[in-house]
Amino acid sequence: LAVFDTAGEVVCAKKRFLPVKEGQLGLRQSDALFHHTVALPEMLAELGSEFDLTQISAVGVSEKPRPVEGSYMPCFLAGVSAAEAFALARGIPLVRTTHQQGHAAAALFAAKGEELFREKTLLFHISGGTTDLLLCDEVKHIETLGTSSDLYAGQAVDRVGVKLGFGFPAGVEVSRLAAECDETIKPRSSVRGMECSLSGLENQCNALLTAGKSPAYVCKYCLLCVADTVVKMTKAAQKEYPGFAVVCAGGVMSSDIIRSWVQQRLPQVYFVPGRYSSDNAIGVSILAAREAGLWLK
């Protein structure tokens, strides 16, 4: 949950991880829907303790993963239900958007404020459920230019982490352990144009562990392979879209190791703070303000 004001400032934001049993790689949709339903009233109360909710002028909600036909996940129903109830009770507009557009809005805002909302931008959205290179047109229209043909980057990172005994999601722990490795590593990535394949990454990491490489080495190798994939896909995109700003978002892109590798090779690429890069409601609140005519008029 987040509050964004008409002055273009994030007033407050709340988030919490849903509980995942040890050794598992996520939640079933029925369990995710249940936990969302339980958490939302509690988090709304927390938000209300920091901000006067009677001052809210519009409500935004992500109703599905992506702005394409057929995109659907049951757990989004919890947020839609809560948002509809709040908006109806207050008699204020309800703005429906998507998880992907929320990520895009938060990342573009963190990168350059309102500037990137007025132009076309290249955006990497890399998380547990996406490895997408997107062409964003004011976040109103999003076109997928490239993606993974199999495993997503976040899945690869989480699988390595869970195999090493970390809880899900494992990205933070994988990054922490990777930082302990000072060996020089040459990653191997599979990229063709703006498309990539990451299924081999999991196998490579398992083989390295079997060969006796340290967990820290394997974690660093995994993250650098993701980083190298980003570099190659970005270079391919820049050939077709020269001069476009490039912004990286998604939980995986919060890694300092990935950021350092990419920016050493592509210093013009924008990475945004973890607060705006990982899953959050900030982008959705920004889009609600814009679509309701309260910001970026």
Regions found by a protein language model. Name each.
Residues 1-34, 141-144:
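Short glycine-rich, Thr/Ser-proximal phosphate-binding strand/loop in the N-terminal lobe
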Residues 2-4, 11-13, 115-119, 124-126, ...:
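A short helix-loop
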Residues 14-17, 35-50, 229-234:
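Short, well-ordered amphipathic alpha-helical segments that serve as non-catalytic structural scaffolds
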Residues 45-81:
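Short beta-strand-loop/turn "lid" adjacent to the catalytic site in phosphate-handling enzymes
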Residues 61-64, 127-129, 247-255:
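Glycine-rich beta-strand-to-loop/alpha-helix junction loops that act as flexible
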Residues 92, 96-121, 286-287:
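Conserved phosphate-binding catalytic cores of ATP/NTP-utilizing and phosphoryl-transfer enzymes
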Residues 103-107, 272-297:
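Glycine-rich phosphate-binding/hydrolytic loop that grips phosphoryl groups
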Residues 175-246, 252-271, 289-297:
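A contiguous, well-structured pocket-lining segment that forms one wall/lid of small-molecule binding clefts
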